[in-house]
Amino acid sequence: ELPGLPKGEKEQQEAIEHIDEV
């Protein structure tokens, strides 16, 4: 979890990481 990121930004980052795994 990166500090300084908005909550929505954090959720998008997690979604992007899951896409990269697939």
Curated annotation (Swiss-Prot):
Q: Name one GO cellular component term.
A: cytoplasm
* Keyword terms: Cytoplasm
Compartment(s) where it occurs, according to its Swiss-Prot or TrEMBL record: Cytoplasm
User: Major place of localization?
Assistant: cytoplasm
**Does the keyword Transport belong to this entry?**
no
Where are the annotated segments for Disordered?
A: 1-22
Composition-biased stretches, type Basic and acidic residues, lie in 7-22
Tell me the function of this protein. Answer: Has a role in the physiological regulation of fucosylation processes.
Its quaternary organisation is: Oligomer.
Q: Please report which protein family the annotation says this sequence is part of.
A: To human SET/PHAPII protein.
Protein name as catalogued: Fuctinin-2
The taxonomy runs:
Eukaryota, Metazoa, Chordata, Craniata, Vertebrata
